[in-house]
C-alpha cells in the first residue's frame, strides 16, 4: 500500500471523526491496522498522533511507558502531551485545566477507577469488541 493512500485514509478518519465530535461530547472511533511495505502501522495510534499534532490543548494516553517514550522521541512537538496509563492519574488530574480534549488509545483497558477519575461513563458501541482498538475523544 502506498504511503499517500495511508495518509489519505488517516485524513478521512480525522475529518469524519471531527465532524461527529462537534455534535457530541464523546466520540468512539473504530480503526484498523494498516499494512504496508511488509510491515504494520497501527491506524488508531497514528490517528491519535495526528490529532495531538493538530490540537495543542489535547492530551494523549497510551498503553505503556515505552510506547509513550517512543512516540515522544519521534514527535518531540507532542512529547509533553502523551502519557502512559501508569502515569495517567497524576498526568491528567495535574494538568486538567490545560487540556480540553483527551485522546485515549485502547480505551477498553480502562478500569472503573480510571472512569471515575475522568468523570465519564464508558459506553461501548455494540459494533465494537474488546479485540478492536479504538480511540475515545472526550471534551472536558
What annotation goes with each model-predicted range?
Residues 61, 101-103:
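Structural motif
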Residues 3, 21-22, 64, 76, ...:
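Short, structured coil/loop segments at alpha-helix boundaries
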Amino acid at each position: 500500500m502506498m504511503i499517500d493512500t495511508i495518509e489519505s485514509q488517516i485524513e478521512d478518519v480525522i475529518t469524519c471523526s471531527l465532524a461527529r465530535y462537534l455534535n457530541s461530547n464523546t466520540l468512539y472511533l473504530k480503526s484498523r491496522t494498516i499494512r504496508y511495505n511488509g510491515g504494520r502501522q497501527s491506524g488508531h495510534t497514528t490517528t491519535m498522533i495526528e490529532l495531538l499534532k493538530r490540537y495543542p490543548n489535547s492530551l494523549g494516553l497510551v498503553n505503556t511507558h515505552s510506547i509513550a517514550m517512543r512516540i515522544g522521541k519521534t514527535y518531540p512537538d507532542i512529547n509533553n502531551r502523551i502519557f502512559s496509563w501508569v502515569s495517567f492519574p497524576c498526568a491528567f488530574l495535574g494538568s486538567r485545566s490545560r487540556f480540553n480534549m483527551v485522546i485515549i488509545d485502547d480505551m477498553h483497558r480502562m478500569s472503573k477507577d480510571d472512569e471515575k477519575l475522568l468523570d465519564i461513563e464508558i459506553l461501548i458501541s455494540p459494533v465494537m469488541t474488546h479485540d478492536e482498538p479504538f480511540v475515545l475523544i472526550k471534551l472536558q
